[in-house]
Every structure is written in C-alpha cells, then in structure tokens.
Design a protein with these regions (language model features):
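Short, low-complexity disordered leader/linker segments with a strong preference
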Residues: 1-8
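Extracytoplasmic
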Residues: 8, 51, 61, 87-88, ...
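Bilobed "Venus flytrap"/periplasmic-binding protein-like clamshell domains
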Residues: 8-36, 42-49, 99-165, 265, ...
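Divalent cation-coordinating acidic motifs and surrounding scaffolds
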Residues: 43, 48-67
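Acidic, polar ligand-binding/catalytic clefts
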Residues: 61-98, 108, 178-179
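Pocket-lining segment of extracytoplasmic ligand-binding domains
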Residues: 71-73, 81-82, 109, 146-243
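Ligand-binding clefts/hinges and TM-proximal coupling segments of bilobed small-molecule sensing domains
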Residues: 121-137, 209-279
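An extracytoplasmic/periplasmic, membrane-proximal ligand-sensing/linker region
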Residues: 154, 158, 165-166, 175-188, ...
C-alpha cells in the first residue's frame, strides 16, 4: 500500500532564462518565503524557450502556478493579441518591480540617441520573447520601419557578447541590476542611448502600461547623468482557475517578505511601495481586463 503523502507540492513559479532578471527574482522569492512561517515552498521554473511570455501559455496548460510577465504582455495574453494566438484567462497576483528597458551601445561608437539606430545592427532579444516586441513598439513610435535597421534575435547573454565583440552596434537591455549588464559594463565602456523628449512621449503612448522612469547617474558604469527612460512594470500572475486560498497564501507571504526581498535582490527595491498601489480595486482594472485574482484581493485587504 502506498503511504499517504502529507507534504504539499511546491508552488511552481515560471521565470525566464537562467541567469536573467526573472530567474534571479524567482530565486530571491524562494529564499525569502522560506523565512516566512507557514509560507508555501517554491519551485523556480526557468523558461525552456528562454522567454518569459511563455509563462502565460504554461499557466494555460497547467504547467506552472504563477509566472513573471511584463505588464504589456499580461494585457496581450488576456486579450489574445500578438504575440499570443488566443486569449488566456490570466489574473494578476502581485507587482514585482518597475525598471528601465533601455538601449546601449559601445561608448566608443557614434551612437548617442535611440533615433541614431537607423541603419545599424541591434540585438533586440529572443524573437518569441517579450523584449523583441517591446523594442518594436519603440521603433514604431520613432518611425523606424522593418527595413530601417537590422534586428538580431538573440538572448541577453549572446547579445551582450555580440556588442562586446562589435558584431552588433547596440543591444536592448532589460531592467538593472542584472548579471549580464553588470558583467558587460566591466568588460567594455557602454553608453546608454537617450530619447528626444517627443520620441519618449510617443513610445509611452504606443506601449501600454510602460511608465516614464529616471535611470540614475551611475546606475551602470559610464552613465554620467540622470536620463529618462521607458519603465516596464513586471508582474507575478496566475490563472483564474487557481484557487483563491492558494493565491492569498502566496501573495500574503510576498507582502510580509517585501523588505527582505529588497535586501536579497536589488530588483525588488521599492516593492513595498508598489504593493501599496495594489491595495484597491481601481489598480486591478489597469491591465486590459486581467484584474487582481480574488485571492490576491483578499491578501491586500487583509
């Protein structure tokens, strides 16, 4: 007779490519929640495809319980628009971080602004990932068409290597601090490309739920002034079918662990303030119909 298993299964959280920002945040979540009494055990699940938008499809398939996704792709998943082929009944659990997506070039290049990318080779991320369509939103806002630059579809690490060796002229980077960006800036001097104010305004109109954010002087080696950039809000999401008690338990533990998470991973700095914006129903309507899961609402109102 098979003995009864009393140990609950761990909560599976889908992240991104190994070593990427979502993956390291997932590891920090696992570590922080271990310190919270009665919090569930966490299994960090990397993306086999190296892309975080895969998490929406894995939620639909029941392969994970929660997943990291940037806010614009939460909207796309809920509404079934590109890059998704069908609507997914996704729900928001918690904010994870707000950070800049930004273009970098070698400091010894002639590139200074995003508009200078015309005619250049740019590493924009994986073709089926979240970064590439984000970059396309920027290009569209600036009137940069399909034939105006050469898009190179590679992961963050390969894109950084290509920039270091001069194989590409620029790279679209994810929020800092991240290991790839830190290691690259120690190898070569880089320049963060800036936006003309009308171009940044146009990009904010094109890309839903991005926010203006200030990238502070010294945030990466060689950045010698504060510069406004596109800020992406990254979210922890789940499927509508996941039971409210489980969601409430996970979100409640994240709320309790917010300060600890900020110490474990600088990407979580400011998490407590972001959580406060989720303590009302108005924020829940901000993601294209993908509102807060009922269990998350209970956690915020508890």
């Amino acid at each position: 007779m098979t003995p009864r298993q009393d140990t609950p299964l761990p909560i599976r959280i889908g992240t991104g490519e190994r070593g990427g920002t979502f993956y390291t945040q997932g590891l920090a979540l696992k570590a922080a929640l271990k310190r919270i009494p009665h919090a569930p055990d966490i299994e960090v699940v990397e993306s086999s495809a190296g892309v975080s938008i895969e998490n929406a499809n894995r939620l639909e398939a029941g392969e994970i319980d929660f997943g990291f996704i940037a806010a614009p792709w939460v909207v796309a998943a809920k509404q079934g628009t590109a890059p998704f082929t069908r609507a997914i009944d996704i729900r928001v659990a918690a904010p994870m971080n707000l950070g800049p997506n930004f273009f970098i070039a070698r400091a010894d290049s002639g590139l200074r602004k995003v508009s200078d990318l015309r005619g250049r080779r740019v590493a924009v991320g994986m073709k089926d990932g979240g970064m590439a369509p984000h970059a396309e939103g920027v290009f569209a806002a600036l009137g940069i068409g399909p034939d105006d630059l050469d898009r190179v579809y590679v992961d963050f690490a390969e894109g950084a290597e290509m920039l270091a060796t001069g194989t590409v002229d620029a790279q679209f980077q994810c929020p800092i601090p991240n290991r790839v960006m830190s290691e690259l800036s120690e190898r070569i001097l880089v320049r963060v490309l800036t936006y003309d104010p009308p171009h940044l305004d146009a990009a904010l109109k094109v890309i839903p739920h991005d926010r203006r954010i200030i990238m502070r002087k010294g945030a990466v080696r060689g950045l010698d002034q504060d510069v406004p950039q596109l800020g992406v809000l990254n979210l922890l999401v789940t499927h509508a079918r996941l039971d409210a008690a489980t969601v409430q338990r996970v979100v409640g533990a994240i709320i309790l662990a917010a300060a600890d998470l900020g110490r474990l991973d600088p990407l979580f700095a400011g998490l407590a303030e972001l959580i406060e914006t989720f303590r009302g129903e108005r924020q829940a309507a901000d993601f294209g119909g993908a509102g807060l899961h009922p269990g998350a609402l209970r956690a915020y109102q508890g």
